[in-house]
Every structure is written in structure tokens, then in C-alpha cells.
UniProtKB/Swiss-Prot annotation:
Residues 98-126 are annotated as: Leucine-zipper. It comes from Danio rerio (Zebrafish). Residues 72-94 are annotated as: Basic motif. One of its GO terms (cellular component) is nucleus. This is Jun dimerization protein 2. It is found in: Nucleus.
Length: 156
């Protein structure tokens, strides 16, 4: 190409014959390697492993892999969101169940306590009645016959 000529868009650096250490590498690979080398030189957070891993593949493959990674992350986030919602629902159901069970047991406890109070009151009334009856009672423990003839009438 002569000075002042407009370059032909069909002619690329990779299609021109060249001599030197870069001969035989496609232009996209060289461009990508130069970009990564510049990023690495500027001190970005690319490790040598990442640099070596990406430097051997064309930009489209890297972009496709990044898209795949993004898609995988998106699917994982979505699955995690669904799992978290399920977990919250189970926890809420368990809490509701335990709350209802607690209320039921409290009611049962209250009923049993009132029943205990009724029985204590009835017992107290029976004790009072028994104490009132004792002075007038005909049957005494000393006059009860032995168990040999429990049905025989008493002699008095």
C-alpha cells in the first residue's frame, strides 16, 4: 500500500505476508493477547493463570464462555431464590403449626387446672360432710366385725 492510499477493508494484518516472530498467528488472537497483556501490565486483578487461560483463546470464545458463566450464575441465583422462598415457607408453616399446638396445649392445661380445682373443692366438701357425720355415725371402726363373715348382721 502506498502512502496516502485508503486501506482495503478486506485486507487484514493476519492476511498480509509477514516476517518475524508474530507470523502465523491470527490477528484476533494477537489483538486479544495485546489487550490482556496491557490489562495485566496496568495492574488489574488478572492473575497469570487467567491471563494464560484467556490468551490462548479467541475473543469470541471468551465472550461465549463469559455469557455461559453469566447464564449459569443467573440460573443458580434463580434456583437459590426459589429454594430460599421454599425454605421461608416451610419455616412459616412450622412456626404456624407450633403456635397452634402451643395454643391447644395451653387450653388443655387451663382445662385440667380448672378440673383440679373442682376436684379439690369437691374433696373439701366431702371432708366437711364426713366430719359433720362422724359424731352421729353408728358404725364405728371398733364395732366392725372381722372379714370372716362380712355379710352377717351386726350384734349390738
Amino acid at each position: 500500500m502506498m502512502p496516502g492510499q485508503i486501506p482495503d477493508p478486506l485486507v487484514t494484518a493476519g492476511s498480509l505476508p509477514s516476517v518475524g516472530p508474530l507470523a502465523g498467528f491470527p490477528a484476533t488472537t494477537l489483538t486479544e493477547q495485546l489487550k490482556l497483556a496491557e490489562l495485566y501490565r496496568l495492574g488489574t486483578v488478572l492473575s497469570p493463570l487467567m491471563l494464560n487461560r484467556h490468551a490462548k483463546r479467541p475473543f469470541d470464545a471468551i465472550k461465549s464462555e463469559d455469557d455461559d458463566d453469566d447464564e449459569r450464575k443467573k440460573r443458580r441465583r434463580e434456583k437459590n431464590k426459589v429454594a430460599a422462598a421454599r425454605c421461608r415457607n416451610r419455616k412459616k408453616e412450622r412456626t404456624d403449626f407450633l403456635q397452634k399446638e402451643s395454643e391447644r396445649l395451653e387450653m388443655l392445661n387451663s382445662d385440667l387446672k380448672s378440673q383440679i380445682e373442682e376436684l379439690k373443692s369437691e374433696r373439701q366438701q366431702l371432708i366437711v360432710m364426713l366430719n359433720l357425720h362422724r359424731p352421729t355415725c353408728i358404725v364405728r371402726t371398733d364395732s366392725v366385725k372381722s372379714d370372716e363373715h362380712p355379710l352377717e348382721p351386726r350384734e349390738d
